Amino acid sequence: MPLRRLSIQWKITLLAGLCLLAIVALLVATSLTQAHRSAALVNQANTAMLEDSARQRLQAHAETQALRIQRYFMDAYQYGNGFARLVQVLKDRGGSDLRAELTRQARASLAGNPDVIGLYLVFQPNALDQQDSHYLGQDAMGSNESGRFSLYWSQPSPGTLELEAMPETMLGDTSIGSNGAAKNRWLTCPQDTARTCMLEPYLDEVNGRQVLMTSIALPLLEHGKVVGVVGLDIGLANLQQLSVNGRRDLFDGQGQVSIATAAGLLAGNSRDDSVLGKPMDKSVADGLLRVAHPFTPIPDTAPWQVVLELPESVLQAPAVALNQRLDAHNQNANLTSLLIGLGTAIAGLLLVWLTARGVTRPILAVAARLEDIASGEGDLTRRLDYAHQDELGQLTGWFNRFLDKLQPVIAQVKGSLQEARNTADQSAAIASQTSDGMQQQHREIEQVATAANEMSATALDVAHNASQAAQAARAADQASQEGLQLVDSTRQGIDRLAAGMNTAMDEARALEDRSGQIGSVLEVIRTIAEQTNLLALNAAIEAARAGEAGRGFAVVADEVRGLAQRTQVSVEEIRQVIEGLQQGTQDVVGAMHAGQRQAQDSAARMEQALPALQRIGEAVAVISDMNLQIASAAEEQSAVAEEVNRNVAGIRDVTESLAGQADESARISQALNRLANQQQALMEQFRV
């Protein structure tokens, strides 16, 4: 191996350097991993924090826009509410010029508020002064064709006012307008709900152009009942301008501001004013963030919404820029860590190399001393000198003690080599004599091995014959057991047969009794037939005496007598059959008695045969056990003979081996003699 060929200095340097590099690499990798994780956590936290800050900024901007819009509507609401109170005061005061006063006050109020497009005041029929019939068609008094007060002042442009009395057709127009509600919703909503209503934005023509507007309608209540409606039309162009201005303030105009009504219609859109009055698209495009802030334009109305939309890329731009700066800083820090780790590893390798050199320098000095001893003709009187008490000092000390022990041993070996040479000569002579004795012993063991083989063959024959006899005895034992089972089964069958014959005898006796009963019945029938015959004969005689009058009766009497005679004949035949049946039954009963006695005798003989068969089985089992013992003994004798044969063969092999070893011992003795001479020459090289 290349590693084995390296010096200790390089091995220490290499292994320690690898460990140092592994530790430095592990520390640097751990530092880089932790830095990467920290950077990821910081990036995630920064992104979340900046996104949250941006969302809060969007929410705050939406609240600001909502407050501006709410203030715009609240100004109009306060204006309408104030005018409604004025109308209520004027109505309560009354007077013949009430309609003219209301018309003048409405004009003055509208002229003072140029942002309002129109102001209207509508009373229920005869709800103002109970004089609608006196003002038919008087538009200047705000009365329509039915005399109903339905005043409408419009302001197409600031300072330009136009008076109109709304006709009944307009007040009752329920057709659907552009905002999806009835055109007279401005009137019916406060009447039906008795609450302030704000209509969905709708388009109306003002000075020849379509203007998006809405209406705020307030009910006039009297004793809890709606008697009229005050309303004002507000243009929503200011809302569009608010949305455009809000977009400029939203991330340098990169977002979008929309104002949506309660029904989802657009009242303002900073991107496209052509969609005003149309439903807002509720779907959000990918990569776009939408924030909606609800607000109530005026009290007691459905909430509107200020909807802000901003691309997520714009929202995340500060976080992305910060993350990029952090990534650049982390890369520089990682590069610095790598350079520091590399410099540390190089410095550590240099220190390890110097340390290894300091450790191996004394070892090289000791090796040089050992080389000097080895090359100095085996002088065992020289010793190593090393003054330090470190591991190398222990090595030199123990080596000197080893030489202290080795020097007298070598001296003794040199003195005993001559004695070893003489002993080797004597060993050669003894080995030759041992070889001759081994040859004689080998011939005698050959004869013993032949006799052991013959005895082993005889023992095998005996074991084989005994095994066959044991098998035959086992077969006989099995046959006797089967015979015993058959005899027992036969005995049980005979017992069942005897029981069946007893039952049959009882039934035969019962049959014989029933046959006797049948004979008695037949005897009664025969007697009845004889009496019937006599009665029929007497009847025939009486009929003959009667002449023609008894001829029919004579015919019947003849028929009855014939039937009685046939009955007697049939009864006689049945009696003969019954007597034959009774005789057969008696014969069967006698045969059954004989069979029963024979079955009982057979069962008794079977009972006697069972013990004999059991004794035969026991004797056969004893014979089988003895044969098995004989076979086992013969097998053991054969095994012993085989063992003796193997032992004799082993002794023969050992004898042959000993003979060969004796010859080999003689040769070894001669070789020992030569080796002793060589060792003597070698020992002469050491100086003790």
Curated annotation (Swiss-Prot):
Give, from the UniProt record, the effect of changing residue 202 to A: Does not bind putrescine. 24-fold decrease in affinity for spermidine. 16-fold decrease in affinity for cadaverine
Organism domain of life: Bacteria
CDD domains, alphabetically? Answer: HAMP, MCP_signal, PDC1_MCP_like
* A Pfam family this chain is assigned to: MCPsignal
Q: How does it sit in the membrane?
A: Multi-pass membrane protein
Name of the featured protein: Methyl-accepting chemotaxis protein McpU
Residue span, HAMP domain: 357-411
Q: What is the effect of changing residue 186 to A?
A: Does not bind putrescine. 100-fold decrease in affinity for spermidine. 36-fold decrease in affinity for cadaverine
The biological process GO terms on file are: chemotaxis; signal transduction
Q: What does this protein do?
A: Chemotactic-signal transducers respond to changes in the concentration of attractants and repellents in the environment, transduce a signal from the outside to the inside of the cell, and facilitate sensory adaptation through the variation of the level of methylation. McpU is a chemoreceptor that binds and mediates chemotaxis to polyamines such as putrescine, spermidine, cadaverine and agmatine. Also binds histamine and ethylenediamine with much lower affinities.
Q: Which GO terms describe its cellular component?
A: plasma membrane
> So what does mutating residue 204 to A actually do?
Does not bind putrescine and spermidine. 12-fold decrease in affinity for cadaverine
Q: Binding residues for putrescine, per the UniProt record?
A: 202-204, 233
Q: What sequence ranges are listed for the domain Methyl-accepting transducer? A: 416-652
Observed effect of gene inactivation: Mutant shows increased biofilm formation as compared to the wild type. Mutation decreases plant root colonization.
Give every Cache domain span: 50-284
Query: What keywords would UniProt list here?
Result: Cell membrane, Chemotaxis, Membrane, Methylation, Transducer, Transmembrane, Transmembrane helix
